[in-house]
Amino acid sequence: MRSGFIAHVRFDENGEPIEHWLDDHLRDVAKLAAEFADLFGADWAHTAGIWHDLGKYNPEFQAYIRHKTGYERENAHIETAGRVDHSTAGASYAVEKLGVAGRILAYLIAGHHAGLPDWHQELGSGGALKKRLENKTHLQKATAVSIPADILAAPNLQPPALARQAENFALWVRMLFSALVDADFLDTERFMSEAKFNQRGQYQSLTHLREVFNDHMNTLAINAKPSQVNEIRADILRQCREAAEKPVGLFSLSVPTGGGKTLSSMAFALDHAVKQGMQRIIYVIPYTSIIEQTAQVFRTIFGDENVVEHHSNTDPDKAEKENAQSRLATENWDAPIIVTTSVQYFESLFAARTSRCRKLHNIANSVVVLDETQLLPPEHLKPILRVMRQLSAHYRVTQVLSTATQPALKTQLDPFGRVEREGLDDVCEIISASETLYQQLERVRLELPDDFQTSRSWEELAEELEDYERVLVIVSRRQDARDLHALMPKGTYHLSALMCAQHRSQVIDEIKRKLKTDESVRVVSTQLVEAGVDMDFPVVYRAMAGLDSIAQAAGRCNREGLLSDKGKVVVFIPPKPSRGLLGKAAESGVSMLAALAGQTLESLPPQMFTQYFDQFYNKLNTLDKAGINELLMPDNQLGDCQFRTAALKFRMIEDGDTYTVFVKFDEKAAELLATLESMGPERWLMRKLQRYTVTLYGYQFRPLL
């Protein structure tokens, strides 16, 4: 029996209003949310769905949607200041009917438009949940009318075992929130824009994509030239396929740079996902420059339609070709293969906003490949490791820690056996005898400075570098790259984040072309080339840094092992030391290598990286600088959490005193900027302009005014 209350309104081709009935909307959202939360709390998601819009039964809301708006399209769904509050009523009803357990639903329902709230006073805008629940007016008005009994029925909900552990509570609530929000968006979209809704979910299965991948790998194997490096890569691939037979859990893939991690990890992910009945593969990569490269590799294999690239710097030319389906998939990650940034992935796992949280339920029952794990931000390492433990333990997520320099992520005990640093335990290493593998892939000699306390001048280095026709120099600071580049011979390339992404992409393509044709090419770059950018130089210079950075720099030298002798990597002390985390990393690197001053090393053994990361982490005052874990631990058994404050404080990249500058780099940028001036900051436009932005610190920006 339909009660005649309206949830949303759309208009037909004649401008006549068509109603989306509230009873139908609540039941359909409940059903869909329960499906999304099948692994971790279907009954909770169902109840949240059926109560989320109880406030729309309020006669004031019905009058608003029927009369005040005149059925205006743009006002039919979005709740903003000045509109009738329709989310507090359902939250209050949950607490009234279920007591303390109802608070969990209250977080979801109260936040389903504005985002998950804090229990107590918030840092950001919006009312804290505790205060909102004290106001019973919204509930009284909504329940004063006749509502179907099945919608008001209160089930007997008991939190699952995982949610009874305090450290698991916040992620569980966020996962439920994701299921509710995505279900609400999709059901509304199904009514408001059926054509858009029907474009979703039309993907090939992972089973089919595995067949496509296997055909591609067979072709590569047939055409591969015989070499020791290719033999080693084939063995790495074999071991990845064997490890894929193991149960869901945590894995590490410790392979030296140039060992073919990208394709081997995809082989593992596909085989494992198909065997375990998983729904998607998510690649998490630290830098957008690597994402573009990796996503292109996967698109070539699987086709554009099956790979979704989700980050800010999408190429505008590709964006023109981007279909509606891939744009929609970035909203909730329902595609089979997702390639995204560490920032997007981890900030979503700690988010409060609906747009960020919406995708979370689709991380469950997936394979997540975390590329370049050594770049996990140490200031947030504790909360990141906690959420990683939970994903594998409770949400059927297999995580692969893929890097040439595995960080020290195991739980550390003090001399008395007490936990000193929580970490990841029971991690299965995919590659057997990885130390032997590192020795087999030794392709460089590492020359250390005679004295780690004495710096070299840029002038001295520039003069020395002129002797090489093909050389890459990597420094840690953008200003260092500028200073050295200014002293280098004409034609030397510069790469840093002071260039917009479009400019960097063009320069990288030009460098790669010259490397292939054996032309003279000198490059001065910041560390943005260290992780995953496929360049191969005979000589690489690296300013003193952490051991992981030195190893990554070495990965740009004699990458394919084609030199008659080994490549040459020179570590030098720059004129000015780095500050902050980079400075502490360099200090830890010096303390590890100081006893070897003046020596030439054949390799950096894997165990040295474990010791280095232990020392580096111990140098830091805290591995949870923002206190995220404390904010997300319920104060008591009542579930008092500070979701919004934690989301605001969890920032992989500190905003600080920074400014975004648009660069009129080419004709495309000029056109986009002209459109910006005439139209203002439309979302689609700002997305395209991302590739033409540079972030400046205040001290760099203010002199430009």
Task: Walk through the language-model features, giving the residues of each.
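Accessory nucleic-acid engagement/destabilization modules that flank
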Residues: 1-216
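Conserved helicase motor
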Residues: 9-11, 288, 309-322, 475-479, ...
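C-terminal helicase lobe and adjacent C-terminal extensions/tails of nucleic-acid helicase motors
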Residues: 42, 392, 459-468, 474, ...
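Walker A/P-loop
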Residues: 247-269
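Conserved Walker A/P-loop ATP-binding site and its immediately adjacent core
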Residues: 270, 278-301, 314, 408
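Inter-Walker segment of RecA-like/P-loop motor cores
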Residues: 303-350
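SF2 helicase catalytic motif II
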Residues: 342-346, 356-394, 399
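Interdomain hinge/linker at the junction between the two RecA-like core domains of SF2 helicases
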Residues: 405-466
